[in-house]
Amino acid sequence: MNLSFAAIDFETATGYMESACAVGIVTVTDGEITDEYYSLIQPPENEYWRANILVHGITPEMTESLPGFHAIYPE
């Protein structure tokens, strides 16, 4: 099977797309997982909506000392 792709998943801290608080990436080559990446990210001003926390379980305390998206993007 020649199935190759990358799947990307973002979790957000608020209802705004620029509030990423986590990113996960999986690369599949010829139907096999060949690479995985996951990182928590500090969203702007470390602001979270309670409804979003209930969905993914990520809290402000978990990201308060982490870099923002622009710092991890080169990875």
Language-model-derived ranges and their functions:
Residues 1-75:
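Conserved non-catalytic scaffold segment of RNase H-like nuclease domains
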